[in-house]
Amino acid sequence: EKSIFRRFEKLKKIEKLAEENREEIDKIYKKMEGHYQKVGIVKYDAFHEMGGKLSFSLAMLDMRNNGFIINSVHSSEGCYSYTKEIKLGQCAIDLGSEEAEALSIAMGE
């Protein structure tokens, strides 16, 4: 009889621990929603006279498809970087073809 009661006590402790673990996992998922977890990158030649695909568009998005695109254009005079904000997978500013491709890759399309 004591053995059965001990097992029930252990079972109650395990159930309580499992519930605490579920709550902690839920907290972790909530925190993850705002972290960048989707990435798309496209390397390209911005100018025909430049080779090596030194320019790139990089899209970084969170779980809700919010984030940004960095476009880095490499030329013989220097390297220029531009950013565009992404909200719910959309950009208020027109995207170049490489930027749109990077966004599409990040969104899994």
Where in this protein do the model-derived segments appear?
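Polybasic/polar functional segments that serve as interface/processing modules
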Residues: E1-F56, L61-E109
